[in-house]
Amino acid sequence: MNLYPINAGNFKLDGGAMFGVVPKSLWQKTNPSDSNNLIDLTARCMLIESGSRLILVDAGMGDKQSEKFFSYYKPWGDDSLIRSINNAGFSIDEITDVFLTHLHFDHCGGATVLNSNNISVPLFKNAKYWSNKNHWDWATSPNSREKASFLNENLIPIEESGQLCFLDVKSPGFNHYDELGFDVLFVDGHTEKQMIPKVSYSGKEVVFMADLLPTAGHIPLPYIMGYDVRPLTTLEEKRRFLNLAVKEGYCLFMEHDAHNQIITLKETEKGIRFGGSLSLKDL
């Protein structure tokens, strides 16, 4: 097995929204903001090469939307999904599976693209697209709070193409899925049934954190995004996960942290905190 970091692009979001009730005087120590209160973020996906399978975990926000749409998210840098896949030595037609942790636009937008007729179609024509029915139903009949994050042009083409597949939601904790060859944890704080994958690699357990832990600055328990639909649920999910991660020595692959690809954790007098920064090449 091989794992590759795939940078699908970089963007900025309001630091206050990213840290909820935590004062700026605290969160800016780890995530400094610009003059508009925006902090640097990235869309770091992961590519899993396992036998004949090439599984992409998340796909960034893509480039289908209007200039006005992107003006809110201030893209920066030259990274892109297709370029990063090519730089890893693969083509988009070789992708066999796309595992979408959840269907907010910054995680799934790159999975579809506009064709020559300006119609949104799946980018990965030979791939199965994985979600779960609970979350799919949640996203396609969205609540008012999340409606702006669930975009039909990102979702409907996947369903209409016949490439959409659902994982069964299993009991709490990590459960193994033979369909994909790795374990998945379902969490409900950020959105309904977000899927967190865990991959055994080089003798380590690598967990793709998605929005359960957006950046290393979110490790302290109360540091929860204002975007989360159930913040108290996130608090308990983080508590359970972080305790398990320290106990088992997990390596946390950070999707949105612009500065840390992988982090480790350690116990301190103040609770679980940042232990160190690594990359997949270090494992």
Segments predicted by a language model, with ranges:
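Cap/insert and terminal regions of metallo-dependent hydrolase folds
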Residues: 72-83, 200-283
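Metal-dependent catalytic neighborhoods of phosphoester/phosphodiester hydrolases
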Residues: 108-119, 264-265
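Zn-dependent metallo-beta-lactamase
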Residues: 1-56, 61-65, 69-72, 170-173, ...
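Active-site metal-binding loops of divalent metal-dependent hydrolases
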Residues: 8-9, 59-62, 103, 134-135, ...
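Metallo-beta-lactamase
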Residues: 76-79, 84-90, 94-106, 121-186, ...
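Active-site beta-strand termini and strand-to-loop segments that position acidic
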Residues: 48-51, 198-202
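Residue-level marker for buried hydrophobic side chains located in beta-strands
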Residues: 55-57, 99, 129, 206-208
